[in-house]
């Protein structure tokens, strides 16, 4: 995924070249990436071979970053979700890079954003219970001298969870 992040200029140029068939394919696979080539062909009006060729190109360009299943945290014993606002002690490139690396290497962090505003990072974290989250905060936040502070919001209800991006041409 690191390579995908480094190709933003290519993706921005490519976004201008998406045609209706690409958009239809992307919208279809964002909803269900288990559709067969024949089912995709019916939805977008192309042959199954053309659909596969286009999907391969979209993957190679990084437009499609991954083909994954979205797993319910609750179903696998991680029913507690937190949104955590993290502020760094100083905003220096080496500190930011070090914290980004720690986010990538920490299994409890599902999503991490480097942001502007009141915090430096927003994290989505899951835990099996609050005791496990407390242990995580001690290890991940309190033992890290680069962190000035953090604020936790506990999610009461997951109203919507999707990675589908609205696409228009």
From Swiss-Prot:
Disulfide links within the chain: none
Molecular-function GO terms, alphabetical: sequence-specific DNA binding
Domain of life: Bacteria
InterPro entries for the chain: ArsR-like_HTH, AsnC-type_HTH_dom, Dimeric_a/b-barrel, Tscrpt_reg_AsnC-like, Tscrpt_reg_AsnC/Lrp_C, Tscrpt_reg_HTH_AsnC-type_CS, WH-like_DNA-bd_sf, WH_DNA-bd_sf
Listed Pfam families: AsnC_trans_reg, HTH_24
An example Gene Ontology CC term for this record: cytosol
The keyword Nucleus is annotated on this UniProt entry: no
Keyword Cytoplasm in annotation: no
DNA-binding region: 37-56
Keywords carried by this UniProt record: DNA-binding, Plasmid, Transcription, Transcription regulation
One BP annotation, GO: response to amino acid
Residues annotated as domain HTH asnC-type: 18-79
Protein name: Uncharacterized HTH-type transcriptional regulator y4tD
Originating species: Sinorhizobium fredii (strain NBRC 101917 / NGR234)
UniProt lineage: Bacteria, Pseudomonadati, Pseudomonadota, Alphaproteobacteria, Hyphomicrobiales
């Amino acid at each position: 995924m690191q390579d995908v992040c480094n190709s933003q200029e290519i993706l921005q140029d490519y976004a201008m070249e998406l045609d209706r068939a690409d958009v239809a394919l992307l919208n279809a696979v964002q909803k269900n990436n288990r559709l067969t080539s024949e089912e995709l062909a019916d939805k977008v009006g192309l042959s199954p071979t053309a659909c596969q060729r286009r999907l391969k190109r979209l993957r190679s360009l990084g437009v499609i970053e991954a083909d994954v299943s979205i797993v319910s945290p609750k179903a696998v014993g991680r029913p507690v979700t937190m949104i955590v606002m993290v502020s760094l002690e100083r905003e220096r490139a080496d500190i930011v890079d070090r914290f980004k690396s720690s986010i990538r290497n920490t299994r409890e962090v599902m999503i991490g954003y480097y942001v502007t505003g009141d915090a430096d990072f927003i994290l989505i974290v899951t835990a099996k219970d609050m005791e496990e989250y407390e242990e995580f905060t001690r290890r991940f936040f309190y033992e890290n001298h680069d962190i000035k502070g953090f604020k936790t919001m506990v999610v009461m209800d997951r109203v919507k969870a999707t990675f589908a991006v609205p696409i228009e041409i």
